[in-house]
C-alpha cells in the first residue's frame, strides 16, 4: 500500500508517495514486456499500463517523452539489437517513489550483451513517470580533483 508523506524541500513542500517492491515489480513487468513487443499497437497498450502519458526516458543526448516517443525508442532498440531483449537482472533499491534497478540486454543465446542501471521514478498513481538509464561505467576522477577528497579506485574500473 502506498503511504503518503510530505517532504519539505527548501521553501516548498513536495507530496511524495512511498512505494514498496511489489508496486514497482507490478509496473515493471508491463514496462519490460513493452520493450519485448514488436507490434506497435500492443506496445502502446503496455506503455499505457506501465507509464504516465507524459513519462520520460532520459538519455545522454535526448529525452523520450510520452507514449509515442518511448515506443519509437523501443522500435530503435529492436532495429539496433535484433533478437535481443531488455530484462530486469537485479532486485530493487527503493527510496520513497524511486528505485535503482539493474537491467541487461540479453541475446538469443541468453548471454548478457550489456548491463546497466536505471533510476525509475513512479508517479503518485503508481505508474512510471521517469527513467534515467545508465549503461556506461563511471569515468575516472579528473586529475585536478583534490587527492584528499578522492577515494580509492572502484573495482572493475580501468583505474583499479
PLM regions and their residue ranges:
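A beta-strand edge to alpha-helix "cap/lid" segment located at domain peripheries
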Residues: 20, 77-160
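Acidic, Ala/Val/Gly-enriched low-complexity intrinsically disordered segments
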Residues: 2, 16-17
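Short acidic-aromatic low-complexity motifs
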Residues: 19-50
Amino acid at each position: 500500500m502506498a503511504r503518503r508523506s510530505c517532504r519539505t524541500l527548501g521553501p516548498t513542500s513536495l507530496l511524495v508517495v512511498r512505494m514498496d517492491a511489489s508496486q514497482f515489480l507490478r509496473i515493471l513487468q508491463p514496462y519490460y514486456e513493452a520493450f519485448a513487443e514488436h507490434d506497435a499497437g500492443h506496445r502502446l497498450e503496455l506503455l499505457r499500463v506501465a507509464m504516465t502519458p507524459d513519462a520520460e526516458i532520459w538519455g545522454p543526448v535526448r529525452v523520450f517523452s510520452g507514449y509515442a516517443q518511448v515506443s519509437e525508442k523501443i522500435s530503435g532498440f529492436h532495429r539496433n539489437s535484433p533478437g535481443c531483449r531488455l530484462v530486469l537482472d537485479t532486485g530493487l533499491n527503493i527510496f520513497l517513489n524511486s528505485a535503482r534497478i539493474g537491467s541487461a540486454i540479453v541475446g538469443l543465446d541468453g548471454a548478457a550483451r550489456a548491463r546497466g542501471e536505471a533510476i525509475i521514478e513512479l508517479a503518485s498513481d503508481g505508474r512510471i513517470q521517469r527513467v534515467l538509464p545508465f549503461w556506461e561505467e563511471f569515468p575516472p576522477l579528473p586529475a585536478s580533483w583534490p587527492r584528499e577528497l578522492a577515494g580509492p579506485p572502484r573495482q572493475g574500473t580501468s583505474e583499479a
